[in-house]
A protein has these predicted regions:
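A short hydrophobic beta-strand segment most commonly corresponding to one strand
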Residues: 46, 91, 106-121
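A generic "binding-loop/recognition-motif" signal
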Residues: 61, 80, 96-97, 106
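Short beta-strand His + acidic residue motifs that chelate non-heme Fe in jelly-roll/DSBH
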Residues: 55-57, 75-76, 92, 98-104
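Short acidic-glycine-tyrosine-enriched beta hairpin
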Residues: 80-94
């Protein structure tokens, strides 16, 4: 693991990556992580879902903490849909089935905190 160092930057200084074919219109920026920044506990990501885009319906053994910073979306957690917008927070428990969908005509953007790999089950 990289030694932890302070970091201050604009999120757009971090390159965006795509999620892949199963997540049309979705990009991710790992703005704080264990590999580049030495974050010992949590990684922070900015996820952007373009109009008409969505993440795959998926599950994993770790939680998500989300904070919506732009646009409107719909989040499905274990079969229940929730409408979300700027300022809303979302907690996805470990092993919950979930997906994110852009519900508007501008990007749906949110922060997503997850544990670093060494703390994942």
């Amino acid at each position: 693991m990289t030694e932890p160092t302070a970091k201050v930057c604009h999120y757009t200084d971090v390159p965006a990556a795509t999620f892949g074919d199963d997540a049309p219109g979705v990009s991710i920026r790992w703005v704080i992580d264990e590999t580049k920044d030495g974050a010992p506990t949590y990684a922070l990501r900015v996820i952007e879902v373009a109009p008409g885009g969505h993440t795959p319906d998926h599950t994993h053994p770790f939680e998500h903490e989300n904070f919506v910073i732009e646009g409107k979306g719909r989040v499905q957690i274990d079969g229940e849909w929730h409408d979300v917008g700027v300022g809303d927070v979302v907690f996805v428990p470990p092993s919950a089935q979930h997906t994110y969908v852009n519900a508007g005509d501008v990007p749906f953007k949110f922060l997503c905190g997850i544990p670093v790999s060494r703390l994942m089950p």
